[in-house]
Every structure is written in C-alpha cells, then in structure tokens.
Amino acid sequence: IFVLTGHQLKLNSQEEKKFLTLKSEIVNVRQGHSFDYPIKFIYRKKNLPVKIIDVWENFKKIQDYDNNQGWIHVSKLSKRKAAINIKNNSIIFKKPTIFSKPLARLEKGRLVLVKKCKNLWCKISDENYTGWVKKEFLWGKF
C-alpha cells in the first residue's frame, strides 16, 4: 500500500502577491524544490525582484519579470525592496507629483532600489539618481 502525502505548503492570499529579492550577486535557480534537482539557470543580479508563486519547505518557486520560473532556497532571498521599471522612459521626479522637477528618465527594464512608497508614487534610487516614480511603472517589492 502506498500513501502519498503532500508536503507542499499552500500559499495564503498575502503570499500570492509577495515579492522578494535576490540576496546575492549569483543565485542558482533549480528545476525542483531541493538541492538534488539540477540547476535550471543562474541569476547574476543582486536585488532582482522575484514573485513567489509556490512554497515547498525551505524552497520557494519564483517567477521573474520575464516569466522565467524555478526554485530558490530561502537563504538566497531577501526582503530588501527593489523593482524593475516596466515603462520605457519613465520620468524620475524630485517630488511625488508630475508638477515637480524632472531629474532623469529610466529605461524599461532598469533595476532600482525602492526607498518608500506614498500613495501612487515610490521613491527610488539607482547609481545616479534618487527621486520619485509612479508606482504603476514598477514591478517588484515595495
């Protein structure tokens, strides 16, 4: 007699929308939910946001902005806030209003750190600028 039991943990409604970021510069993504599974691909981008779509013990199944999926050990994930700009030429403003001074433009796909969010705006930073971008133009953890 075989009895199959599922160890998979069901995501609650908050986790379904949860994002985390990559803790290290290099992170292995596996085909399954243990170190026994082969590496599917490797991320080489610290702070890259990933969406959590499933959980199995100490592994989380993630999906990135380009819809790539795989499993990452929890030790390689962080709660640091970061996002990807999803609109070409988003404007970074000095204050959270379109009537504020424009500081720069963000190209689509640009990774930014998120300092805080206020209503429809997020204060972000990259290597060159710190300012406010509309939240609707960001994908990730904030």
Specify the residue positions occupied by each region the protein language model found.
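Bacterial N-terminal signal peptides
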Residues: 1-6
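SH3-family beta-barrel domains
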Residues: 9-31, 41-46, 53-95, 99-120, ...
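Second-shell loop/turn segments in exported
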Residues: 33-37
